[in-house]
């Protein structure tokens, strides 16, 4: 696997020198300063690429070229936003950048309720608490009909939890959910958030898939033409939330994508930390079935708790993800490609890491502190080395 590292640009507290010292050779980044929907110019792409290469690294993957909400709702100026997206892909290809990670999550990108969940060893992790999320949705957001998405027990627990929250607790929970986590291109006030949810009131799973199909049928032929590989990122968490449909959550969703536009440019990001939240997702089977279309991997683990919809981000080699079997399946896919004469490695990043050691004293992007990711990258690197030596050395 190609070892990569997500970098949020010149303002990232983790420098490119840090990235190189961590042992990564590739950078995963995006032009976050360009508004959603606008074309990424060749000039801006080359400017960022030069910064990365001057640090002795390569720009391996774009994560992400964000999709304008008008495309997802099939309203407003969506045709122009699609045309802009097509041009951005052409410009990236012209600059030699050919792997693009993206997602089709409506309104919210990835979300968590707790950004400083303290683990037994004193390090901090990200956590999604189903009951806290229910308390936010029913008692802070006050979304009409939200109760239908929860069990009677969860409704009672959420009311009890809300009753014990201070004003600061409520404000922090709201910020965590709607203000935008790293990589999310949109942040909202509560009123803005309600208005955006309202735009989806008539959009169910079938309709969102229909809108996604319009996007894919416009984008994938361009990607194919210019040699770009599109790698969709799964929903996080991988299930409907806030009354919003989610359509990249299961192996059935992956198959739907392939059936909708059967092109090798139409591929996947295997994010084990997102897909792995669901107990019914067999990660190894997903890799084996769709291996030729996996162009990027995020390798981290999560741990489901007593309420199976509550989870926290575990250490990379712990939790519910069998990292050994996952890495073995990815390495096997790389060797299959090599036998076909394809030498390209699959870019891998350790995704998130725990806030630990000296990073506990620093301001860091949630999930993206340096030391926790350094640890995760080293651990996954070791797993891969052992697998390569045990099964593929000649």
From Swiss-Prot:
It comes from the Bacteria. One of its GO terms (biological process) is D-glucuronate catabolic process. Gene3D superfamilies: Divalent-metal-dependent TIM barrel enzymes (3.20.20.150). It catalyses: D-mannonate = 2-dehydro-3-deoxy-D-gluconate + H2O. Keywords: Iron, Lyase, Manganese. InterPro entries: Man_deHydtase, Xyl_isomerase-like_sf. One of its GO terms (molecular function) is mannonate dehydratase activity. Is inhibited by high concentrations of Fe(2+) (> 2 mM), and by EDTA or other iron chelators in vitro. Its cofactor is Fe(2+); Mn(2+). Optimum pH is about 7.5. The activity at pH 6.5 and 8.6 is only about 20% of the maximal achievable activity at optimum pH. Mn(2+) can substitute for iron, but in higher concentrations. Cannot use Fe(3+), Ni(2+) or Mg(2+). Changing residue 52 to V: In strain: MT78. It is an enzyme of class 4 (lyase). Its EC number is 4.2.1.8. Induction: By fructuronate. Its expression is subjected to catabolite repression by glucose. Pathway: Carbohydrate metabolism; pentose and glucuronate interconversion. It holds the Pfam family UxuA. Belongs to the mannonate dehydratase family. Catalyzes the dehydration of D-mannonate. This is Mannonate dehydratase. It comes from Escherichia coli (strain K12). The gene is uxuA.
